[in-house]
């Protein structure tokens, strides 16, 4: 009995079991650990793994990011780089606190403080790692290699100390400051947010607001109305009526033209236009017809001219009498005027209630007059600050009015709009209310609308070094590359100072201590635990609140010895912590000072251009004056088939673990790595997983089939194959060259961070291996003698696997590992092997054979179109190309002047000599035709059609298009020199340049197909005679015998006895005519027709015949 050197494989394995076996093998043999430790520390590839939160299960976005990270980390490992993959956990911040509040059944600052900050933070510490073990299961099952045992957590004391160090460094460089400014504020979380947090996923969404137009009564009229004893009012528009109680100023535009309209609610009214009325009409004594006390009694409204049309429309719809004063005012006519406060809450505010010119006022929305509340708008804040108007912000941390607004105290701002509008109506200040739909920022954690309010906060002075960030960004290789100067580059150019403090509980504390007595000011900033222990004389085991808040000491600058240094109550924005990850994860600079480097590669979802990528860039530039990473993939989003986000509410996705158990990890990995989602596009994933199943069927199964074919026949022959690169056979040399070309192309793609292209190359390669090399070499494997030719065929497959499995390993780590181990190569694991070194290959041979394959595919597509089975031989085929013998007969290509030289089978420079007949035989055998005819003239078989590029020609000669179309229809065109087209006749003609036209090949026969980008045509002769019919039937009989062998579970090498039972005379004739052929193809010892069937025979019925076999 022949020895078996390879595993017995089955054609349809349980891929799920195979994957689990490989994962178990990796874990038991510590393959991942070895892949790191066996690489030199002097040859590192630095990879940053952005930390996720562990208070929720992984979703498809996490899996996608993980697949990308793992693929390129594995690839670099195979390039002999040391790639450490330390996993990290984001532990602090709003996600953790919101989760803890929900679990504890409490909400808001007051309830947390009542519950106890110590107990609350203890709960956060536990709950934030709630799903860490589940995460490990998911990550391991997706075949991603990471170091969980040496993980880092942003709540670790060592990590937090490095964050404190970073803050101290920035402070010492003058890049950190404290200030009261208007910031985005989440009243639901009771904390400010940074400006980039308002640009995260769907932070801006549609919101319907009540916009109100309000009349502000001037205490002194503009110069144009000094002599008029009527009230002048400025109309201002706002989408936040709840901010009106805090109004302290009005802003107008420097270059805006303003107009005045008189409103007379009780007088008889005649509508007039701006052009038809004179100024005297408006100012005349007849304009005082309304009774005293009316809210609109002869009042003059002033607003931007651009608002006049809207004003008139509203007035007419609501029967409000009005007249245009036909007086134009400039900003300077209004600037400096004082006006009556809408409400009395802050009527005594210093320098307030005046009109100011501001650059930001436009006419796009509203009235050209902007209501200004410095406590609730950034531009408002700076305008009032420049005029020494104090800031008023009468709301508490939960977004409710304080006692300063007495009749609204305790009312949430968004619930106060109707009350404010009612009060405005009651006092005659209201003009109109409208529904206004606009995009409005929402909290990224609670989905509640944000407000803008003044808050004290610590800031990183990003504006001081943002130009340097723009410079450093030019060094980064972004995928897709438009991110560099587009989404990310533009964001850097418009960067603001970054608010990094949060008035929350669970986070790294801001390491600032201040004197509690303003008479003896002092600020201490700490950058290490050692400094804290030195000054406060205490051993520090935990840096979290509330312990850190208990550290106090006497103010050294206070001679009275009474004031105390106390820590500011804020903690860091968790984005500051994640931006510190590159150095904080290794406790830099307290440890590993020599190790810290910029990342060679990172990847995350594209929105991180305004999140993690940005914070990394800010801190790396400010602290180290260098870019934080060199290569960055910004991937897209996984959506459902309707383009909706995957969500539990919509129930539009399957649990990833269910997908792994149904289709395996490799299939999902390959689907994601091969799609446009890698370069910023989106992936539509159906809940049933059909697209994943297709990968299993069309990618992984073909790879397995080639391996199964090898082991099945190699074990049958008892051969132990070898890696060998030199062969005599054309098809062997082609397959080896094709493999080396694929390996080189995959490496180039992976070097360019294009897994999408690498996956395409892999698919194309296995198409060639299965459907060209193996299929064309079947008879070599089937023959009984183990000669050199057969040995070469085994060695080719074994060699091809040796190279391509290593190239494919980062993309399909599980199936490649299984096959690698089955083929028993030297290295224990394919992932411990090095990526294949580039080998020389015969590019001309590849070009020839690829075109042969293309000719065959074109011919086979004709058969498929007309349902002509491949087993049915045809009489002949015609191949048209430029030269009669250049491609298959070995002569160099040459242009025949009489013919248009665009139709060709091979590119110029490809020559065939001794091997030409072999190519012809391949084509005839593959297409199953008896003869092949090469022609170099179109006459009788095809014609050329001219197709004009109208978009291009329309720009050059737009008035001649109709004439050109006419000449084309009349066939008045020919090719001239330099690939130009002469179109027309002697009286009128035009030269059509290359690119302005396309020549299409159209065959006379319907049994035809073009190939090689319209450079050649194949025509099949489909007429059948008796001889061809009989041969086709004989081939069908062979197929049915082989199918019966498979059904009987006979081995491929088993010799068999065959009995055919049929009443069809044609089938009998075919068997008798092709008797020896059928026996040879089926390894039949005997072949009988309609004889007695013994008891040991296995029988199967088919249409028109039955097949019985015995071994």
Curated annotation (Swiss-Prot):
One GO location term (cellular component): cytoplasm
Binding residues annotated for ATP, in chain numbering: 648
Subcellular location as annotated: Cytoplasm
UniProt motif ('KMSKS' region) ranges: 645-649
Cofactor(s) demanded: Zn(2+)
A Pfam family recorded for this sequence: Anticodon_1
Keywords: Aminoacyl-tRNA synthetase, ATP-binding, Cytoplasm, Ligase, Metal-binding, Nucleotide-binding, Protein biosynthesis, Zinc
Enzyme Commission number, as recorded: 6.1.1.5
A single GO BP: isoleucyl-tRNA aminoacylation
GO molecular function, one term: ATP binding
Catalytic activity entry: tRNA(Ile) + L-isoleucine + ATP = L-isoleucyl-tRNA(Ile) + AMP + diphosphate
Functional note: Catalyzes the attachment of isoleucine to tRNA(Ile). As IleRS can inadvertently accommodate and process structurally similar amino acids such as valine, to avoid such errors it has two additional distinct tRNA(Ile)-dependent editing activities. One activity is designated as 'pretransfer' editing and involves the hydrolysis of activated Val-AMP. The other activity is designated 'posttransfer' editing and involves deacylation of mischarged Val-tRNA(Ile).
Domain notes: IleRS has two distinct active sites: one for aminoacylation and one for editing. The misactivated valine is translocated from the active site to the editing site, which sterically excludes the correctly activated isoleucine. The single editing site contains two valyl binding pockets, one specific for each substrate (Val-AMP or Val-tRNA(Ile)).
Family the entry assigns: Belongs to the class-I aminoacyl-tRNA synthetase family. IleS type 2 subfamily.
Name of the molecule in the record: Isoleucine--tRNA ligase
Protein species of origin: Wolbachia pipientis wMel
């Amino acid at each position: 009995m022949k020895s078996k050197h390879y595993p017995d494989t089955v054609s349809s394995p349980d891929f799920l079991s195979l994957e689990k076996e490989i994962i178990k093998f990796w874990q038991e043999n510590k393959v991942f650990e070895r892949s790191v430790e066996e690489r030199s520390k002097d040859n590192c590839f630095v990879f940053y793994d952005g930390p996720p939160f562990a208070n929720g299960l992984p979703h498809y976005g996490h899996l996608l990011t993980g697949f990308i990270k793992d693929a390129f980390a594995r690839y670099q490992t195979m390039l002999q780089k040391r790639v450490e993959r330390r996993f990290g956990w984001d532990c602090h911040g709003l996600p953790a606190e919101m989760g803890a509040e929900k679990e504890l059944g409490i909400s808001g600052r007051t309830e947390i403080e009542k519950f106890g900050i110590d107990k609350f933070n203890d709960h956060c510490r536990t709950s934030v790692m709630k799903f860490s073990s589940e995460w490990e299961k998911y990550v391991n099952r997706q075949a991603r290699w990471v170091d969980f045992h040496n993980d880092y957590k942003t709540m670790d004391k060592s990590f937090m100390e490095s964050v404190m160090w970073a803050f101290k460094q920035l402070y010492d460089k003058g890049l950190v400051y404290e200030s009261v400014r208007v910031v985005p504020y989440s009243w639901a979380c009771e904390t400010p947010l940074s400006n980039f947090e308002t640009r995260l996923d769907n932070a801006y969404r549609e919101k319907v607001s009540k916009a109100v137009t309000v009349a502000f009564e001037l205490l002194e009229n503009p110069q144009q109305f000094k002599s008029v004893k009527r009230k002048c009012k400025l109309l201002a528009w706002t989408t936040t009526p709840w901010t009106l109680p805090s109004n302290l100023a009005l802003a107008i535009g420097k270059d805006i033209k303003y107009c005045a309209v008189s409103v007379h609610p009780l007088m008889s009214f005649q509508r007039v236009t701006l052009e038809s009325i004179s100024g005297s009409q408006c100012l005349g004594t007849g304009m005082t017809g309304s009774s005293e006390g009316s809210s609109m009694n002869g009042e003059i409204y002033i607003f931007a001219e651009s608002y006049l049309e809207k004003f008139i429309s509203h007035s007419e719809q609501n029967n409000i009498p009005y007249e245009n004063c036909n007086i134009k005012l400039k900003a300077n006519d209004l600037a400096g005027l004082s006006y009556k406060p809408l409400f009395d809450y802050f009527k005594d505010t210093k320098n307030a209630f005046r009109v100011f010119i501001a650059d930001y006022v436009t006419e796009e929305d509203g009235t050209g007059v902007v209501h200004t509340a410095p406590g609730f708008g950034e531009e408002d804040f700076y305008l009032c600050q420049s005029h020494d108007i104090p800031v008023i912000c009468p709301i508490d941390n939960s977004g409710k009015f304080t006692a300063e607004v007495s009749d609204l105290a305790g009312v949430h701002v968004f619930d106060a709009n109707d009350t404010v509008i009612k009060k405005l109506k009651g006092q005659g200040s209201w003009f109109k209310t409208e529904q206004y739909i606009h995009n409005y920022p929402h909290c990224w954690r609670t989905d509640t609308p944000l407000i803008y309010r003044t808050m004290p906060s610590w800031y990183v002075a990003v504006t001081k070094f943002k130009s340097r960030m723009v410079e450093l960004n030019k060094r980064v290789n972004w995928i897709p590359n438009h991110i560099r100067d587009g989404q990310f580059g533009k964001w850097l150019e418009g960067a603001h100072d970054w608010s990094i403090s949060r008035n929350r509980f669970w986070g790294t504390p801001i390491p600032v201590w201040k004197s509690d007595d303003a008479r003896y000011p002092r600020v201490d900033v700490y950058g290490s635990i050692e400094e804290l222990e030195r000054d406060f004389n205490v051993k520090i085991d935990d840096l979290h609140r509330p312990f850190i808040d208990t550290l106090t000491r006497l103010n050294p600058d206070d001679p009275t010895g009474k004031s105390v240094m106390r820590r500011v109550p804020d903690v860091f924005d968790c984005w500051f912590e994640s931006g510190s990850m590159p150095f904080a994860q290794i406790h830099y600079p307290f440890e590993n000072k020599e190790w810290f480097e910029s990342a060679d590669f990172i990847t995350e979802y594209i929105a991180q251009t305004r999140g993690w990528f940005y914070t990394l860039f800010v801190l790396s530039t400010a602290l180290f004056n260098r870019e934080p990473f060199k290569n960055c993939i910004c991937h897209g989003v996984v959506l459902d088939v309707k383009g909706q986000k995957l969500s539990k509410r919509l129930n539009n996705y399957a649990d990833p673990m269910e997908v792994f158990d149904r289709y395996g990890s490799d299939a999902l990995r390959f689907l994601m790595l091969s799609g446009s989602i890698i370069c910023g596009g989106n992936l539509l994933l159906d809940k049933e997983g059909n697209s994943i199943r297709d990968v299993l069927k069309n990618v992984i199964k073909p790879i397995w089939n080639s391996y199964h074919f090898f082991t099945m026949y190699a074990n049958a022959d008892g051969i132990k194959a070898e890696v060998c690169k030199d062969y005599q056979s054309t098809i062997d040399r082609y397959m080896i060259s094709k493999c080396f070309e694929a390996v080189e192309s995959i490496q180039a793609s992976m070097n360019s961070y294009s897994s999408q292209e690498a996956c395409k190359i892999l698919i194309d390669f296995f198409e060639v291996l299965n459907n060209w090399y193996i299929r064309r070499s079947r008879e070599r494997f089937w023959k009984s003698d183990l000669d050199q030719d057969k040995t070469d065929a085994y060695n080719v497959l074994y060699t091809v696997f040796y190279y391509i499995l290593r190239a494919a390993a980062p993309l399909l780590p599980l199936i490649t590992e299984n096959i690698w181990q089955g083929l028993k190569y030297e290295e224990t694991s394919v992932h411990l092997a090095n990526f294949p070194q580039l080998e020389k290959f015969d590019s001309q041979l590849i070009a020839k054979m690829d075109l042969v394959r293309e000719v065959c595919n074109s011919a086979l597509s004709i058969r498929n179109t007309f349902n002509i089975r491949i087993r049915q031989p045809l009489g002949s085929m015609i191949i048209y190309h430029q030269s009669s013998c250049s491609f298959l007969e070995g002569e160099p290509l040459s242009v025949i002047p009489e013919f248009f030289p665009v139709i060709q089978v091979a590119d110029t420079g490809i020559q065939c000599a001794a091997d030409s007949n072999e190519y012809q035989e391949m084509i005839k055998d593959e297409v199953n035709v008896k003869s092949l005819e090469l022609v170099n003239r179109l006459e009788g078989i095809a014609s050329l059609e001219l197709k004009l590029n109208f978009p291009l020609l329309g720009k050059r000669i737009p008035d001649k298009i109709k004439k050109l179309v006419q000449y084309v229809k009349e066939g008045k065109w020919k090719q001239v020199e330099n690939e130009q087209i002469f179109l027309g006749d002697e009286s009128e003609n035009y030269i059509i340049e290359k690119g302005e036209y396309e020549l299409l090949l159209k065959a006379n026969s319907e049994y035809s197909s073009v190939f090689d980008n319209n450079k050649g045509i194949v025509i099949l002769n489909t007429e059948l005679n008796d001889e061809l019919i009989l041969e086709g039937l004989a081939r069908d009989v062979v197929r049915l015998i082989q199918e019966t062998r498979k059904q009987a579970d006979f081995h491929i090498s088993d010799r068999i006895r065959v009995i055919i039972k049929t009443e069809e005379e044609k089938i009998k004739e075919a068997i008798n005519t092709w008797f020896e052929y059928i026996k040879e193809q089926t390894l039949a010892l005997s072949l009988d027709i309609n004889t007695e069937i013994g008891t040991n025979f296995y029988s199967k019925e088919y249409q028109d015949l039955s097949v019985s076999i015995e071994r």
